């Protein structure tokens, strides 16, 4: 149990630090959107950046919840506190995923219009993950896939925590 708890503490710390870094980058992108060349897309993209920032902040909180649950397990406490921690994390992740999916559905509906799709494909944004400029359209697609995979992985971590504590 000690090895599992220590592994979970390290995992939670890595999740917390990486997600906090991504939240900071998304927050900075929110500030730079006034410099975009397509004025019609600014409000839409600023809202997406804000939701993106909140999304990574939620995952940073989930990292802290993993640490809290692991410390609770390490102290040989009963399984009930870990179950409550996991339940609150699942609730956070569910709300976050729903908001993220609604936002991306709006992007899809707007992005289907040919005039905007052409501009989105030609509009270049700096992407820290690729360390160069990529099309806004490509970036939105990749972010949606990666973030949903991250939601599923974090939900599975809390499922494992719940099983261990019972």
Predicted regions and their residues:
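Membrane-interface helix-loop junction between the first two transmembrane segments
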Residues: 20-43
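Short, Lys/Arg-enriched, Gly/Pro-containing loop segments at transmembrane-helix junctions
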Residues: 31-32, 108-117
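Short membrane-interface loop/juxtamembrane segments of multi-pass integral membrane proteins
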Residues: 35-51, 116-145
